[in-house]
């Protein structure tokens, strides 16, 4: 009887330990929710692949929250990481948004700080085992900043790779839009539809028609291909582009699924990528002695 009881206790203990082991227990994809020990296991499970969802704080018409880009990009990134495991960095909103400084609630960090903070962040992520970092962009104002940042990684040797994944919307099977896609650029039909899925509690659809999101085209005299920083303000001074009132949950579900699937595919591709770091290292070595590079 005693031996039988002891055996049962031993089996129970082993079962508990096995159930709590990293391989069997559910590891959160949220960096900030992991314990120090679990974080180590999470990095191993993620194959050193981490996501940095990148948002911003800016006006989104009269009907969406200031952090809409951050909320949406984190929604899709977290859902993707749960399908293809990756560690997701906490809220990050230190990007380019000078064009919205005239609107309340906008937080626009200086250009030097934006790049310095992003570099420090990816360096620290890498020091903690994230050797493959996918910056998931959720803000159109970062479309030039982030590729430049990725390119600048060639300035100094690093033991990790930065990848940049852009905003992914639209595609085959997309529901028909009610508004003009050409001006559906900010807090309009598409973005508002996605927000109805990510954070429906923060969408005030009834307020959308109270402000114009029309293109004012105040620089139409300039030729195509000629760039000036005031272009966005010249077209959309209300910092609203499109028709948010046209949003639907049907379109939002399509947008969310498309973006999540795109991130999942990117995570899988990055996990399998062995060439980028090898080529980086080759480039760093050759850069030390450019005169020795075969011509």
Which residues fall in each region the model found?
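Bacterial N-terminal signal peptides
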Residues: 4-17
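Extended, histidine- and acidic-residue-enriched regions that form the cofactor-binding/catalytic faces
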Residues: 20-112, 116-132, 140-295
């Amino acid at each position: 009887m005693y031996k039988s009881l002891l055996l049962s206790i031993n089996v129970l203990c082993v079962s508990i330990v096995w159930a709590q082991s990293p391989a069997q227990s559910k590891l959160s994809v949220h960096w900030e929710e992991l314990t120090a020990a679990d974080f180590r296991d999470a990095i191993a499970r993620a194959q050193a692949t981490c996501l940095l969802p990148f948002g911003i704080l800016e006006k989104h018409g009269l009907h969406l929250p200031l952090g809409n880009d951050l909320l949406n990009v984190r929604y899709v990134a977290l859902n993707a990481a749960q399908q293809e495991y990756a560690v997701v960095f906490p809220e990050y909103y230190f990007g380019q948004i000078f064009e919205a400084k005239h609107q309340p609630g906008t937080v626009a960090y200086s250009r030097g700080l934006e790049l310095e903070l992003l570099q420090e962040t990816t360096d620290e992520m890498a020091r903690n085992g994230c050797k493959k970092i996918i910056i998931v962009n959720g803000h159109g104002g970062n479309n030039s900043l982030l590729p430049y940042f990725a390119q600048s990684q060639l300035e100094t040797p690093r033991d990790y790779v930065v990848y940049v994944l852009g905003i992914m919307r639209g595609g085959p099977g997309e529901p028909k839009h009610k508004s003009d896609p050409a001006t559906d650029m900010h807090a309009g039909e598409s973005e508002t539809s996605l927000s109805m899925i990510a954070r429906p509690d923060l969408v005030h659809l009834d307020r959308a028609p109270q402000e114009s999101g029309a293109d004012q085209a105040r620089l139409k005299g300039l030729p195509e291909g000629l760039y000036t920083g005031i272009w966005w303000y010249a077209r959309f001074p209300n910092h609203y582009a499109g028709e948010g009132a046209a949003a639907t949950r049907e379109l939002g579900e399509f947008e969310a699924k498309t973006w999540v699937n795109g991130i999942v595919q990117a995570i899988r591709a990055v996990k399998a990528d062995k060439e980028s770091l090898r080529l980086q290292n080759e480039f760093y070595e050759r850069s030390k002695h450019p005169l020795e590079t075969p011509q």
